[in-house]
C-alpha cells in the first residue's frame, strides 16, 4: 500500500530537481506522444486529460503538438504544478491539484494520458474504470508505467545481501511493479481495445550511491507502508554486492522496465 502523504511530500521536495534527473521518464513520454502524433493532426480540436503532469514536461509537448486542444492537467504535488505553470507553452492548459484516485470527473475526453505515474496508485483497476467512463467513443486512454523488471539489479543485490547475512524476514529495498501480463489482465475493459508493449532502458552510473541519488531526486524512493530496509549494515552489504555483480564497461547498471498501454474505447457494434 502506497502512503500517499509520504509520496506527496517526496514529490513536492523533488520538484526543483525532477527535470534534471528524469531521463528515463522523458524517453517514456516521447514513446506515448508518438502514438498520439500518428492518431491526430496538429489541427485537431481535442479534449485532453493528463494525469500526473508533474513539472509539465508532457503537458508542454501536448500543447505544442495540439495547439487547438484544451488540456486539463492534474497532479497532487503543489510544487510540481507551480513549476509546470511557469512553462512557456501552456496557455491552453488548466491545472488542478488533486489525487488521481479521488478525482471526480464531470466531462468526457478524447485523450486521457499519463506518463510514469500509475505505479503510484493503490487501486489501478478502479481508476481505469473511472477514466474509461469519461472517455469519448473512439477516444484513447494511454499511459506508461514501470514493469516488474525495474531495478532488478537492486532487488537481486538486496536479496543476496540478506542471504549472505542469513536474514529471512520480508524486508524489501523498494517497490514491486506489475508484469506485462498482470497489467494486461487489469486493463481488460469491456468495449475497449487494449494494446500493451514493453521495453527496457539500461542506465549507467559511476556508483550505486549515484543511482540511488537519482531516484531520490525524482521523488521515487520507497513510499510503501510495508516493511523496508532500515539496517545500515545490510544496506552496505547490498551496495558492495551491487557493485561486485552489476558493473559493466560504463559503470554500474540499472534496468528501467517500461510498459506502454493504450486502450481505444469502441462504440457499440
Swiss-Prot record:
What EC number(s) does its UniProt record assign?
2.1.1.197
Extract the SUPFAM superfamilies matched here: S-adenosyl-L-methionine-dependent methyltransferases
What enzyme category does the UniProt record give?
A: transferase
Write one Pfam family the protein is assigned to. Methyltransf_31
Q: Which UniProt keywords apply?
A: Biotin biosynthesis, Methyltransferase, S-adenosyl-L-methionine, Transferase
Report the catalytic activity: malonyl-[ACP] + S-adenosyl-L-methionine = malonyl-[ACP] methyl ester + S-adenosyl-L-homocysteine
Q: Name one GO molecular function term.
A: carboxyl-O-methyltransferase activity
Check the record and name the Gene3D superfamilies matching this protein.
Answer: Vaccinia Virus protein VP39
S-adenosyl-L-methionine: present as a keyword of the record? yes
- Pathway the protein contributes to: Cofactor biosynthesis; biotin biosynthesis
Concerning CDD domains, the annotation shows: AdoMet_MTases
One GO BP: biotin biosynthetic process
Query: Which superkingdom, per the lineage?
Result: Bacteria
Q: What does this gene product do?
A: Converts the free carboxyl group of a malonyl-thioester to its methyl ester by transfer of a methyl group from S-adenosyl-L-methionine (SAM). It allows to synthesize pimeloyl-ACP via the fatty acid synthetic pathway.
Entry's family note: Belongs to the methyltransferase superfamily.
Query: Any idea what this protein is called?
Result: Malonyl-[acyl-carrier protein] O-methyltransferase
Q: Which organism is it from?
A: Bacillus cereus (strain ATCC 14579 / DSM 31 / CCUG 7414 / JCM 2152 / NBRC 15305 / NCIMB 9373 / NCTC 2599 / NRRL B-3711)
Amino acid at each position: 500500500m502506497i502512503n500517499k502523504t509520504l509520496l506527496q511530500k517526496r514529490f513536492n521536495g523533488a520538484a526543483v530537481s525532477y527535470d534534471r534527473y528524469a531521463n528515463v521518464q522523458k524517453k517514456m513520454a516521447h514513446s506515448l506522444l508518438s502514438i498520439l502524433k500518428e492518431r491526430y493532426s496538429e489541427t485537431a480540436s481535442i479534449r485532453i486529460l493528463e494525469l500526473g503532469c508533474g513539472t509539465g514536461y508532457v503537458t508542454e509537448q501536448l500543447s505544442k503538438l495540439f495547439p487547438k486542444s484544451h488540456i486539463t492537467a492534474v497532479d497532487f504535488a503543489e510544487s510540481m504544478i507551480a513549476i509546470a505553470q511557469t512553462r512557456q507553452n501552456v496557455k491552453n492548459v488548466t491545472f488542478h491539484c488533486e489525487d488521481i484516485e479521488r478525482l471526480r470527473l464531470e466531462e468526457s475526453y478524447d485523450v486521457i494520458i499519463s506518463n510514469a505515474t500509475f505505479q503510484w496508485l493503490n487501486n489501478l483497476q478502479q481508476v481505469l474504470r473511472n477514466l474509461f467512463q469519461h472517455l469519448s467513443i473512439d477516444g484513447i486512454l494511454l499511459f506508461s508505467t514501470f514493469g516488474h523488471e525495474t531495478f532488478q539489479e537492486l532487488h537481486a543485490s538486496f536479496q543476496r545481501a540478506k542471504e549472505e547475512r542469513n536474514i529471512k524476514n520480508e524486508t524489501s529495498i523498494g517497490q514491486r511493479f506489475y508484469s506485462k501480463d498482470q497489467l494486461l489482465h487489469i486493463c481488460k475493459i469491456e468495449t475497449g481495445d487494449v494494446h500493451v508493449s514493453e521495453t527496457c532502458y539500461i542506465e549507467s552510473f559511476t556508483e550505486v550511491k549515484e543511482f540511488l541519488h537519482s531516484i531520490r531526486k525524482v521523488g521515487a524512493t520507497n513510499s510503501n507502508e510495508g516493511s523496508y530496509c532500515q539496517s545500515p549494515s545490510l544496506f552496505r552489504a547490498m551496495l558492495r554486492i551491487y557493485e561486485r555483480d552489476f558493473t559493466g564497461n560504463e559503470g554500474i547498471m540499472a534496468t528501467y522496465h517500461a510498459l506502454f498501454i493504450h486502450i481505444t474505447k469502441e462504440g457499440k457494434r
